[in-house]
Amino acid sequence: MSSKTDTLELSVTATTATDALYWLEHIALRDRWSARLRFTLTLCADEALNNIVSHAFTPGHPAAIHLTLRQTRREVSLHIADNGAAYDPTQALSPPLARSLDDAQPGGHGLRLMRHFMHALSYQRRDGWNHLTLTSHSAPES
């Protein structure tokens, strides 16, 4: 495989994350990704998209999310762009791990998950848009 690109543009609704994950799952099946790549990229995309949908937009703001998936022999990158409030997740600190489930507090653990499973996370703010890229070096199976 030389290079392959897929794109999806969404208005933000109650089903935005679900619609995006369906699109990603379709590509994973079409291109015969490994089970690990499919699981990790879908899990991390779900986390990022749900955070964007839940926290990035104010009521009445025309909200949009654009996804671009680029695949090469060596890596798969999911670029997520949104026109919501500026937020750089690569600069956020993950909360300390709790000693037990009873002590666990919600918040920030999805970022830990993305840092664990992705080989690279990058962020830029350009022209009023957040640009987050999740990259995995796990190549699709052929």
UniProtKB/Swiss-Prot annotation:
GO terms for molecular function: ATP binding; protein serine kinase activity; protein serine/threonine kinase activity. It catalyses: L-seryl-[protein] + ATP = O-phospho-L-seryl-[protein] + ADP + H(+); L-threonyl-[protein] + ATP = O-phospho-L-threonyl-[protein] + ADP + H(+). Type III secreted proteins Bsp22 and BopD accumulate intracellularly instead of being secreted in cells expressing the mutagenized BtrV. Keywords: ATP-binding, Kinase, Nucleotide-binding, Serine/threonine-protein kinase, Transferase. Probably able to multimerize; interacts with BtrV. Its EC number is 2.7.11.1. It is an enzyme of class 2 (transferase). It comes from the Bacteria. Belongs to the anti-sigma-factor family. Possible negative regulator of sigma-B activity. Phosphorylates and inactivates its specific antagonist protein, BtrV. Upon phosphorylation of BtrV, BtrW is released and binds to an unknown partner(s) that might be sigma-B, thereby blocking its ability to form a complex with its partner (possibly an RNA polymerase holoenzyme (E-sigma-B)). Involved in type III secretion system (T3SS). Phosphorylates BtrV. SUPFAM superfamilies: ATPase domain of HSP90 chaperone/DNA topoisomerase II/histidine kinase. It comes from Bordetella bronchiseptica (strain ATCC BAA-588 / NCTC 13252 / RB50). The gene is btrW. This is Serine/threonine-protein kinase BtrW.
